[in-house]
Amino acid sequence: MGKKIAMILGSPDPDSFCRALADRYAESAEQAGNEVRYFRLGEIEFDPVLRHGYNQRQELEPGLKDIQEAFTWSEHVVVVFPVWWGSMPAIMKGMFDRVFLPGYAFKYRENSQFWDKLLAGRSAHVITTMDTPPWYFRLVYRSPAHNQIRRTILEFVGIKPVEMTVLGPVRYASAAKRQTWLDRMSAFARKA
């Protein structure tokens, strides 16, 4: 029996290489018997700004409610995004700000510095692309995008283990290299 996979594409560009990677992963995962709920953030209408922080409730748009329901339903989460300026695209950060709310994804304990991780019991695979050589991003920049998504977002709410796949530099990648990366998506999806 397959897994229940919630999948987020964080690139707003419908013609991006991230889109091709995510499409291949979703298609291969379904062919392998998994159930996939796949969200392309660039196609979902929502305000990515958490207007009042956690001080005032901001109603979730239908697309964000669907994403929240998919996280609840899922056993495995797949997130695909390009690294822009050392981080994730703003639309993806906005989605996490709006969806991973207190009481849903985490809950602060009264009179404590600690919190309950309300999305525990799920694993994740984060797939990123970049034009920077991955070794340079890791050694010189210290992987800020990867630390953010793994430690301060997914693990903060209990999603672990988090597997990371870093592809790059994309800008100079040959057609053969890109095909190799697409084939890796199929292999990852089959073993999800």
Where are these regions (language model features)?
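N-terminal beta1-alpha1 ligand-phosphate binding loop
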Residues: G2-N34
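Residues at the starts of beta-strands that form the adenosine-phosphate
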Residues: K3-K4, E35, S123-A124, P161
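Short hydrophobic segments within beta-strands
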Residues: I8-G10, F39, V80, I127
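A short beta-strand-loop structural module common to alpha/beta enzyme folds
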Residues: N34-E45, T165-G168
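N-terminal beta-loop-helix "entrance" segment that forms/cooperates
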Residues: L41-E59, K177-R178
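Helix-loop-strand module that forms the ligand-binding subsite of alpha/beta enzymes
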Residues: E59-I149
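Glycine-rich phosphate/pyrophosphate-binding loop and the adjoining helix
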Residues: Y136-A192
